[in-house]
């Protein structure tokens, strides 16, 4: 499959997809940050969780590959340090006690490079506390989207490799190979309610699947998005509300 870089609409993210960081609040509890710690928020998005962490620790830094997201984060939370950086190849001058990452690492298809980057950024005994899409995450939506693209002759777009959704076994093995000790790992089913009861799936595709539409006509984009929503309705529309079929991984691991 072809690898691509996704572009982000920070305003749409905040307006209709705030569930991304709302669900991440419980991950901060798993992080259990201490007042004397230096924390790195990897894939911080528009910075809401980074800001929450900032009041609990000595120092926090937010990194994200998207300049649009970092600009939004800096505007909303000027007291917090945010920088543009790629999770697959970032470097730090001073080691961190922990790396926190919510709903970001499935966007990094160079996952081995990301694991190596996290390892070098931690002090000995430091930990990662991460959550992201696991095996079969949004399978219903992505299968329907690829099928609609193929049907209209957009075979190249349908083959795009946009995400990394590993099993628990695959990801924890990669962490151990890199030198981490895995102390907690969980895969779970988390159907996620979408904001708009009329255009929930269309909005989700606009936010998270727009990279599939490079080279697709505007007319076809509209038709495909609506078609996908119609296809998945029997499975993902319940009691008058739209849900995305999220499957999540949570992992805590320490640098030995």
Predicted regions and their residues:
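Class I SAM-dependent methyltransferase SAM/SAH-binding core
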Residues: 40-42, 46-90
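C-terminal helical/coil "lid" or tail adjacent to the Rossmann-like core of SAM-dependent
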Residues: 183-239
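Short alpha-helix
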Residues: 163-178
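A short SAM/SAH-binding and catalytic strip from SAM-dependent methyltransferases
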Residues: 98-112
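A short acidic, Gly/Pro-enriched loop at the edge of an enzyme's catalytic core
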Residues: 88-99
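Conserved class I S-adenosyl-L-methionine
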Residues: 1-37, 48-52, 72, 76, 127-154
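A short glycine-rich, Lys/Arg-flanked "PGG" loop and its adjoining helix->strand segment in the class I
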Residues: 112-127
């Amino acid at each position: 499959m072809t690898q691509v870089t996704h572009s982000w609409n920070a305003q749409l993210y905040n307006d209709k997809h705030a569930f991304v960081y709302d669900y991440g609040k419980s991950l901060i509890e798993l992080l259990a940050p201490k007042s004397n710690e230096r924390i790195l928020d990897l894939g911080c998005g528009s910075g809401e969780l980074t800001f929450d962490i900032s009041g609990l620790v000595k120092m926090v830094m937010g990194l994200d590959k998207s300049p649009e997201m970092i600009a939004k984060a800096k505007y909303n939370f000027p007291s917090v340090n945010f920088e543009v950086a790629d999770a697959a190849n970032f470097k730090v001058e001073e080691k961190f006690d922990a790396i926190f990452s919510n709903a970001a690492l499935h966007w990094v298809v160079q996952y081995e490079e990301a694991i190596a980057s996290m390892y070098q950024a931690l002090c000995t005994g430091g930990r990662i506390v991460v959550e992201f899409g696991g095996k079969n995450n949004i399978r219903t939506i992505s299968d329907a989207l690829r099928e609609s693209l193929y049907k209209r002759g957009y075979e190249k777009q349908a083959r795009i490799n946009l995400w990394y959704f590993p099993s628990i076994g695959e990801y924890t093995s990669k962490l151990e190979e890199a030198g981490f000790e895995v102390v907690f790992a969980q895969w779970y089913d988390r159907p996620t309610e979408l904001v708009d009861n009329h255009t929930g799936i269309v909005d989700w595709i606009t936010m998270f699947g727009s990279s599939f539409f490079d080279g697709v006509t505007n007319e076809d984009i509209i038709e495909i998005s609506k078609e996908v929503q119609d296809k998945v309705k029997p499975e993902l529309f319940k009691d008058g509300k739209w849900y995305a079929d999220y499957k999540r991984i949570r992992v805590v691991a320490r640098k030995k």
